[in-house]
């Protein structure tokens, strides 16, 4: 049988083209099925190990040692960061001699490390000391600090050509006017501010990609339903996440992001709750323009599966 299949694949006969295509498809399908059978449930490097029956973390306290360990795999930051940086470099043309990057909410330091490895001067800042400690241990050669981004004196005036605020970090700032003022102060003229913004009425929760989600892609995509909650299973714990939107979103702009982790052995539970301040995109851009920023570019993040999410690139003109 294998000799017959090999003869089809290696044949130069044009009449065998269709057979070659069908055999190739069959091999791909078999490979997908094999991966599905072997690799589920999804594995995260560090397991869930919690001695207390119940732990509740809110806002800045969410990012402790546990979250630092699982953050990159849980939110798939590697592929997203790689794609985002490719867009930023394509649209702003930085150079390794003169460009200086600042990553706001630098988390585990992955973005800072990628830029540094590509020859750029780059600094990171995060409010979580646990995240900074994790980043320093993982990437000893990067420059990253724990500081308050709301403090205008955190960095000197006109220090950066690029300020990145990705991973929906901007929604953690209640006073966005202050945020934009600080960024404007820290940037040089003709510098760029990169924001990850979402259509708050249409965006989906970022879902961890499990291997069992691999499937044939139809030629005509069905209309997608909005996903604001997920239930997912990992090697050591069950994971649930959801966004809670108020009825009067236009008036309050306050959205809650909740996560729950349940140990599969002990049934111990950890709950995270984060308060997000989600003005609509137009209002956020208008606040930036009032400070002095101008629009430079916009990139749709649908290419990486994040529908109704965008990278906005703003410029400080002078």
Predicted segment positions?
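Conserved class I S-adenosyl-L-methionine
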Residues: 21, 27, 32-96, 98-107, 110
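Class I SAM-dependent methyltransferase SAM/SAH-binding core
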Residues: 109-152
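A short acidic, Gly/Pro-enriched loop at the edge of an enzyme's catalytic core
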Residues: 154-162
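A short SAM/SAH-binding and catalytic strip from SAM-dependent methyltransferases
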Residues: 161-175
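A short glycine-rich, Lys/Arg-flanked "PGG" loop and its adjoining helix->strand segment in the class I
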Residues: 177-189
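Conserved beta-strand signature within the Rossmann-like core of class I S-adenosyl-L-methionine
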Residues: 190-197
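SAM-dependent methyltransferase
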Residues: 197-285
